[in-house]
């Protein structure tokens, strides 16, 4: 086991505080409409330019192990806030730094760290309750666009696009952000359920110009195994032919004799038909087939359920008003499923999303939820160069997360004003002087975001904060973008409550742990062994006669 270096008390806290300051100082320059960019070196390719707090925090790795521990703990504040609210990472970092700095001073003055932490927690709970009480619910598309615009650093086009996407696919729908191949940023909305499997044979195409197979008012057969034997399939095909309706077959695979017969029947015009592979793999494939069955009002034909393909009747097949199949994708629009059953399935998937701990699983479950609940919108972010596209994509991601958070818990006045006002409303009382000091730490610390936003704009923070607090209106504040005071909500300068609340709770949680640290342990760097000397020369060859 390697030897360890242990630091105690004040020495440990000073090192840790230095790490916190280095990380926070790099992150906080990005805060607000006049925040600056940070350039990050990449081991390959062009450097990355970003204004996204968590992206900056993730890149900071310090040489000194004790300083690095402080920086990594503050990085955790940004990461946790990003995971929960998707935005507000810079605000969380600024709050974390402010609480740690104030707390370290109090501990150095001889106060009890545990009581300070209790005081901090008391005050934070009161501020959170105050924010939730003041929250204004979002109702209109314009308000959604305002939140998106603020988070995208004042770019109205992005705000509008997000509002439009949310209007089309609903709050449950999935909105994905991709890099465009062109310089333009555009929005594409897919109605209904789409999955990434195309037709198994180009002979199924009904529109040769667009190379798509369109089936109107179609039956849908869902089978979880491979289909290669024609005999088992015949009863279903005969029943569908009688109805003169098209048929879509979704199975693990359709091959051999079965596929050849389907193609021949399609070409002869006796049967409008198309076949695609089922989406996903393993258990996820079963779940997605079940989703399609519920959406279309059909059943999955599965040996597990004791249903054989030969005994399938028309009422076991799903129905949809329109099915469109391209080379890569299949879209099912207007399935005939019961609304109550779809809602129950949506509820079940939401429950799974809450319970899962893996990001990948959560992402896949959210995709399934969107396909059932609304649809999918794709925002393709364009730009002149790759560096610009990446920077813009960061902002669109933040804006999208902020907008979702705003719809969930409502909005408050932006620009750090909501926290600034809350600092004057804290009435909590500690049971001793040290807890009172903890409450006062929060009073001062929650002014930090508003001060940092004005500092980044080159203004005098104390003057502006004083002027805002002189006015008694909850929504009165300073618009850093144009240097004017006014009603921030009507100006569209708003913050989602969930983002502000999460930032404060995470900052206080980690800062409380840092303040109460009394010892730090890190591995000592390994000393390189001295290089071995060169071997000695050969001895003399004495005593040899020639």
UniProtKB/Swiss-Prot annotation:
GO molecular function annotation: ATP binding; ATP-dependent protein folding chaperone; isomerase activity; unfolded protein binding
Keywords: ATP-binding, Chaperone, Cytoplasm, Isomerase, Nucleotide-binding
Broadest EC class assigned to this enzyme: isomerase
GO biological process: protein refolding
Annotated Gene3D superfamilies: GroEL, GroEL-like equatorial domain, TCP-1-like chaperonin intermediate domain
Pfam families assigned: Cpn60_TCP1
Binding locations of ATP: 30-33, 51, 87-91, 415, 495
GO cellular component assignments: cytoplasm
Domain of life: Bacteria
EC number: 5.6.1.7
Catalysed conversion reaction: ATP + H2O + a folded polypeptide = ADP + phosphate + an unfolded polypeptide
PROSITE patterns: CHAPERONINS_CPN60
Subcellular location, record wording: Cytoplasm
Assembly with partners or alone: Forms a cylinder of 14 subunits composed of two heptameric rings stacked back-to-back. Interacts with the co-chaperonin GroES.
HAMAP family: CH60 (MF_00600)
Protein family (similarity comment): Belongs to the chaperonin (HSP60) family.
PANTHER family: 60 KDA HEAT SHOCK PROTEIN, MITOCHONDRIAL
Function text: Together with its co-chaperonin GroES, plays an essential role in assisting protein folding. The GroEL-GroES system forms a nano-cage that allows encapsulation of the non-native substrate proteins and provides a physical environment optimized to promote and accelerate protein folding.
Protein name (database record): Chaperonin GroEL
Organism name: Brucella ovis (strain ATCC 25840 / 63/290 / NCTC 10512)
The gene coding this protein: groEL
